[in-house]
Design a protein with these regions (language model features):
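Sec-dependent N-terminal signal peptides
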Residues: 4-13
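N-terminal signal peptide c-region/cleavage motif recognized by signal peptidases
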Residues: 15-18
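Structural beta-sheet core signal
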Residues: 35-36, 144, 312
Length: 565
């Protein structure tokens, strides 16, 4: 009998493990959510950052993250176990996994490759995000603070929709028109003058490379952009020109928290991922430690506020980094100084080091390398450098060089070579310059005490966050309401799609009501419709209206035809 009871108990426990660790229907709502994503972060990345911090300051053996670690997340695409930044955070904020490259957009049916069931009728269409629901259904303030350019995958995931994460023109247009309250990011190159004018006309302060302006901004509606593309790696950052991630979070919270209805804030340590893509031993640790300081800022606010939940998670892992490698003999017996001091000798990122070497004559190669890395280059290493086509001062003509390194995703090919040289002098190793498929960490602070434990799927984490805003089970219907195919929304009316006239323009949807002569013109990716007829007017709606070329459809609110009555 006892044996039967034991077997029954084990069966019950196993059955419970297959369910979500916390029932979203029992989660008590909070007023505010801070979603913090460290892009491309493996457990090894966190361990390295923690060791570097402790080695430099023994009074700090733990990260700000550590008290709130509560489980792991299985993060994946809709048709592939290894995630991409676009669909992974997209899943966290929509509740649906999607394909690599898809920004808050529904995936196509890939047959046997599907990990979750797919409705083919929804393929390529936009999916509403938790940020959009918080703004439109609950009147909350919204924004994001990131270190990449603002149309990059993760910030785009919460504020735009398209199946191609690289379509910055359409993504940035949606972000400008999606009523975000605060944006602090890189990416001056991607905000054009027309978009800046639109923001200013709608009460925003726009700060471009103006850290003082950002700090002194009194408006609760602000865009602050730094650099042409991404912000600098933390190890290279000039504090007089760019804010830290923690400072950006503090400024955003001071503005968003003025809304009595609450807020949703996305924070991304964007370049943890970039450093791992580049296999950059100099940048990975400092980049995550900068994110960890932002965690401290966010949690401190949340504890004082008493009605704010902080969700801390990676979207996927990158690089396959290990601490310890076969080529480092007896590494398990080496002291922390032997393992970590060589990394701390690196004074700049690989990209910055490459630029520095290219700014100096060849005669200075060895002393400059020694100054910024602590490494005395061997003859073999010098030979590798002078054969790199990315080294501008090589005594060997480019056509005679025999380059031996691939180009990293976000960095010059020269950085790839420098990665090999620097990494050879450390305890670190990487398996890839791409993403990896292991589960990622999860940390949560909830003033109500309810946090997901153990292993959670990306969809389950999405449901938990929806429940924190009392929106569990409501996001899909909201998505259907604001993103209806134009042929359904305007059924019975005359309509046509006008293709973009040039690269800098967007398609237009023209709808006519022949009964009263009214006509509506919608420019893709905006929230604006022009009405003409007996009287002309411009209306601005709460949601953006994306156009998808693969379906040749605009996606508009289901009641949009009311403006033509």
């Amino acid at each position: 009998m006892k044996r039967q009871l034991l077997v029954a108990l084990i069966f019950m426990l196993c059955a419970s493990w297959s369910k979500a660790s916390i029932d979203p229907q029992k989660v008590k709502p909070v007023k505010n959510i801070i979603l913090m994503v460290s892009d491309g972060t493996s457990f090894s990345t966190i361990s390295l950052a923690r060791w570097l911090q402790y080695y430099q300051d023994p009074s700090k053996p733990k990260l700000n993250l550590d008290p709130y670690l509560c489980g792991t997340v299985r993060t994946n695409c809709s048709d592939a176990p290894i995630g991409d930044s676009a669909p992974t955070t997209s899943c966290y904020v929509t509740g649906h996994a999607s394909r690599a490259g898809y920004v808050a957009s529904y995936p196509p049916d890939m047959g046997a490759a599907n990990i979750d069931p797919i409705d083919p009728k929804k393929s390529y269409g936009p999916m509403a995000t938790l940020l959009e629901a918080a703004k439109q259904l609950q009147g909350k303030s919204t924004g994001f603070v990131v270190t990449c350019e603002f149309p990059h995958a993760t910030p785009a995931d919460v504020s735009a929709h398209y199946y191609n994460r690289g379509y910055y023109d359409g993504i940035s247009e949606q972000q400008v028109h999606n009523n975000l309250d605060v944006v602090i990011a890189g990416g001056n190159n991607y905000l054009n003058q027309e978009q800046e004018n639109y923001l200013k006309e709608h009460g925003y302060t726009v700060c471009r490379n103006d850290i003082a302006g950002m700090r002194n901004c009194k408006s609760d509606k602000m865009w602050a952009l730094f650099n042409g593309t991404s912000m600098a790696y933390e190890i290279d950052r000039d504090p007089s020109k760019e804010p830290s991630l923690a400072e950006g979070v503090g400024i955003a919270l001071s503005k968003l928290s003025k809304n009595k209805k609450g807020f949703f804030l996305l924070v991304e340590g964007s370049k943890v991922d970039w450093a791992n893509h580049a296999n950059d031993p100099a940048s990975v640790g400092p980049e995550f430690l900068a994110f960890d300081k932002a965690i401290g800022t966010a949690v401190e606010f949340a504890k004082k506020d008493g009605n704010t939940a902080v969700i801390i998670v990676a979207d996927h892992a990158t690089g396959g980094m290990s601490i310890g490698k076969a080529s480092l003999r007896n590494y398990s017996k080496r002291s922390k100084a032997e393992l970590f001091q060589p990394i701390l000798n690196f004074k700049m990122s690989l990209d910055a080091l490459g630029a520095k070497l290219n700014s100096e004559p060849y005669e200075n190669l060895r002393p400059v390398f020694k100054e910024y890395t602590g490494i005395d280059l061997s003859d073999e290493e010098v030979n590798l450098i002078i054969h790199s086509k990315g080294y501008n001062n090589s005594p060997i003509p480019k056509e005679q060089r025999k380059e031996q390194q691939d180009k990293p995703l976000y960095s010059p090919s020269f950085s790839g070579l420098l990665s090999k040289i620097l990494t050879d002098h450390t305890c670190l190793a990487w398996t890839t310059g791409g993403h990896t498929g292991e589960d990622v960490y999860l940390g949560c602070y909830n003033p109500k005490g309810q946090v997901p434990l153990g292993m959670n799927t990306n969809v389950e984490l999405a449901h938990y966050m929806q429940a924190l805003f009392g929106l569990y089970g409501k996001i899909d219907q909201f998505s259907d309401d604001i993103f209806t195919c134009h042929d359904v929304a305007f059924n019975g009316l005359d309509y046509k799609v006008e293709k973009a006239k040039d690269k800098g323009s967007f398609p237009k949807l023209i709808v006519k009501n022949s009964a009263n002569g009214k006509m509506m013109t919608i420019s893709a990716f905006s929230n604006i419709a022009q009405i003409s007829g007996s009287e002309s007017k411009v209306i601005e709606i709460a949601s953006v209206m994306p156009y998808v070329d693969r379906t040749d459809k605009f996606y508009v609110p289901k009641d949009m035809a009311k403006y033509l009555k």
